């Protein structure tokens, strides 16, 4: 889980790099702009360019990460993982970076806002602290509002959902069954409720119990379910579209503010100076 979490966290410095490049091009565009293009051309072109570069980099990262890890080389799951990580996640963090940039008065404040919101999304996405241990206030507010919650859930379940779990010898828990009972009879109800498996269900001395029998049990225990995959995919698109709307609305408001507060020329003084 933390490997996937760290792969997602790589976007933090990339967000600031995107903001720096886009701010430079925005300043250049505004100095040289002759009203030949609609005002929305600048932010939309920045998104297209940055997303294309991000997808190329994410594809290389995906090839190095996914197949060398060899957790799940199923072609369908590999395609799902690529779609969520190399396409959707790149769309999200690029539009997030540019949206926060246009929402902020300058690049320095944009860096502060981006870092603050990023910290909230990361801390309460279920990786640093499991869902069951998150305080109720944060569980039902920031947890469900964090985009990382849905990216992490999809990528975790895509890798582990259909994989069996085989415990090493030092990973089994040792239990003593009640007198006259086999391990299978003693642990039957608990395994039915919590999952896991016994190394030998017929023994009556020591029960060797593994906490999980499948990757699905592991992800379900973290409040992550593969059945939510396409629902989460739709939520990802909602975040991306929301970022684009924020970006365009913020830039338009900035242009309106500048036009209303633009200093007016003194026509009278100009006329007098020309006559003289």
Segments the model singles out, each with a brief description of its role:
Residues 1-276:
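Membrane-spanning alpha-helical segments of multipass transporters and channels
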């Amino acid at each position: 889980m933390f490997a996937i979490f760290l792969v997602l966290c790589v976007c933090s410095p990339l967000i600031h790099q995107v903001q720096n490049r886009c701010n430079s091009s925005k300043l250049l565009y505004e100095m040289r702009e002759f009203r030949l293009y609609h005002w929305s051309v600048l932010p939309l072109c920045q998104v297209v360019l940055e997303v294309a570069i991000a997808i190329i980099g994410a594809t290389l990262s995906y090839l190095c990460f996914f197949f060398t890890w060899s957790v799940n080389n199923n072609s369908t799951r590999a395609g799902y993982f690529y779609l969520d990580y190399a396409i959707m996640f790149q769309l999200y963090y690029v539009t997030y970076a540019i949206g926060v940039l246009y929402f902020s008065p300058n690049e320095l404040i944009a860096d502060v806002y981006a870092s603050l919101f990023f910290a909230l999304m990361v801390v309460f996405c279920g990786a640093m602290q499991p869902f069951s241990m998150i305080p109720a206030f944060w569980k039902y507010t920031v947890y469900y509002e964090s985009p990382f919650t849905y990216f992490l859930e999809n990528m975790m379940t895509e890798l582990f959902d259909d994989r069996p779990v085989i415990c090493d010898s030092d990973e089994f828990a040792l239990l003593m069954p009640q007198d006259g009972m086999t391990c299978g009879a003693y642990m039957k109800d608990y395994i039915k409720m919590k999952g896991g498996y016994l190394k030998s269900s017929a023994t009556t001395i020591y029960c060797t119990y593994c906490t999980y029998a499948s990757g699905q049990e592991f992800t379900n225990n973290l409040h992550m379910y593969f059945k939510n995959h396409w629902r989460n995919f739709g939520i990802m698109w909602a975040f991306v579209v929301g970022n684009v709307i924020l970006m365009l609305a913020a830039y338009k408001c900035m242009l309106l503010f500048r036009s209303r507060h633009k200093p007016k020329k003194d026509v009278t003084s100009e006329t007098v100076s020309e006559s003289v």
